[in-house]
């Protein structure tokens, strides 16, 4: 029944669309022809609708997969960030035995003072030269020009070198002092002399204390200078505010504001100018005429 109603509706719609002049010609056609065409159109419409739905489903699946991939990437980034976070290292207190061992090791170590370091000699090369004679544990070198940039600052003026054995450090200082460094023929520092001195009863913590005290003094000087500059700035600001306040008072009372006094002084004439002015014009003419005669 439903199909018959659909067919009747299709026929009536087609009749309404057809021009009345051609109605008789279309009435002669069989009803089956219209039925077949309508069925084919209906099937094609259904198939097209199914294809569109499948395409939409595929697009939804692709979008969903992309969202899942983005979420997975975000999770991986978060994991990487968590792994990058520095772990807090808890420092455990040392045992008494370890403390004793460290004290013994530090007591056995010896330090040599190097008063002059050749130009263009880097710490790695210096350590390589001294490591031939004994094991070097620590080094501290002072730059010659602190204000110079780091990538151009290759000059050191003095240094402290710590050896593992103090007896060996004493021997190295006595033997190598005022002796050429040696090396290959093309080496720049081949003919440079060692300037070494062994420091008895001098340990690495003494050097650290000295450096810390120097740093503290430098920081104190900087703070004092900064405080002085701040005080000067505050005084200037107070003076400016006072001048503004005074000007506002004068304006409210109707008094004229005093202009700043600019003092100018006449410059005295010099002794040479006075002598030149005293010379008469006749004398000048004679001098000029004599010069012209000599030239001719």
Curated annotation (Swiss-Prot):
GO molecular function: RNA binding
GO cellular component, one term: nucleolus
Compartments (UniProt record): Nucleus, Nucleolus
Region (Disordered): 1-84
Domain RRM: residue ranges: 110-193
Domain of life according to the entry: Eukaryota
Coiled coil: none
Pfam family, one: RRM_1
Compositionally biased tracts (Basic and acidic residues): 8-27
Keywords carried by this UniProt record: Nucleus, Ribosome biogenesis, RNA-binding, rRNA processing
Magnesium as UniProt keyword: no
Ranges of biased composition (kind: Acidic residues): 28-78
GO biological process: one example: endonucleolytic cleavage in 5'-ETS of tricistronic rRNA transcript (SSU-rRNA, 5.8S rRNA, LSU-rRNA)
Similarity comment: family membership: Belongs to the ESF2/ABP1 family.
Summary of subunit composition and partner proteins: Component of the 90S pre-ribosomes.
Described purpose of this protein according to its UniProt entry: May be involved in the small subunit (SSU) processome assembly and function, and in the 17S rRNA synthesis.
Designated name of the protein: Putative pre-rRNA-processing protein esf2
Organism listed in the record: Dictyostelium discoideum (Social amoeba)
Taxonomic lineage: Eukaryota, Amoebozoa, Evosea, Eumycetozoa, Dictyostelia
